[in-house]
């Protein structure tokens, strides 16, 4: 690939000067990290909105309720992706922005380990969704068809967005919602968990009393090893070594 010369004017400095400049920015980056942590803590104290209506979706196994989408877990994150008639590129492509979001989705095993399920929903029929998932390599994303007014009721009928829910038995509550540029941050396990009512569920978080919490890092595992005690022991050993060395992992 042929490249052209950069038409950018920047100072070229010594390694010592470069490191000094980086350290100045690092102070601001850490401030931003703490601010994000504080914002996530406020989200965890948001009031909840009870979902009173019954909503129906179509999935690979047939009809499903909103409660079914939790797949037995405590929390649900639902991203409204635009893949349906009227979208540019239909039926070969989903919305290009929604497709980029799908390309960056964290492996679901890590969210599942925090009692959280992530799903996508569109108005395309299941046959088209399954075809698209295979072609784009998105087989690990649970993707449902919206069949009623769910998208309008939850602010995602005309634009993409991400809703977070929690359930108490059979009762479902809406706990948070992001859209527009808010969706840009989505993709990592941590950012998904940060918009939920329970958060990352780690002891360092400022969370309401009663939120489940465990020591940080110790719940991590390889995505195909959750539930394997031997693998978990190896992770714990790595965490302890990191702490002994003064690190975080």
Residue ranges of model-derived segments:
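Non-globular targeting/processing and membrane-anchoring segments
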Residues: 1-114, 134-135, 145-249
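Conserved segment of the thioredoxin-like fold in thiol-based oxidoreductases
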Residues: 117-145
């Amino acid at each position: 690939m042929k490249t052209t010369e950069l038409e950018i004017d920047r100072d070229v400095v010594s390694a010592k000067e470069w490191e000094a400049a980086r350290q100045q920015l690092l102070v601001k980056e850490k401030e931003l990290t703490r601010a994000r942590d504080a914002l996530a803590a406020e989200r965890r104290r948001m009031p909840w909105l009870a979902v009173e209506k019954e909503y129906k979706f179509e999935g690979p196994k047939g009809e499903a309720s909103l409660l079914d989408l939790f797949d037995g877990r405590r929390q649900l994150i639902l991203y409204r992706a635009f893949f349906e008639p009227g979208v540019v590129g239909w039926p070969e492509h989903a919305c290009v922005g929604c497709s980029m979001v799908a390309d960056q989705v964290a492996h679901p095993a890590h969210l599942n380990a925090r009692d959280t399920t992530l799903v996508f929903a569109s108005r395309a029929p299941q046959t088209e969704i399954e075809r698209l998932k295979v072609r784009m390599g998105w087989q690990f994303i649970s993707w449902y068809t919206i069949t009623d007014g769910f998208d309008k009721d939850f602010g995602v009928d005309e634009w993409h967005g991400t809703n977070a829910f929690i359930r108490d038995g059979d009762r479902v509550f809406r706990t948070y919602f992001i859209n527009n540029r808010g969706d840009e941050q989505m993709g990592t396990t941590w950012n998904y968990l940060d918009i939920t009512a329970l958060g990352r569920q780690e002891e360092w978080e400022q969370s309401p009393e009663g939120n489940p919490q465990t020591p940080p890092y110790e719940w991590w595992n390889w995505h195909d090893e959750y539930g394997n005690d031997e693998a978990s022991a190896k992770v714990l050993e790595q965490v302890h070594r990191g702490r002994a060395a003064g690190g975080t992992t």
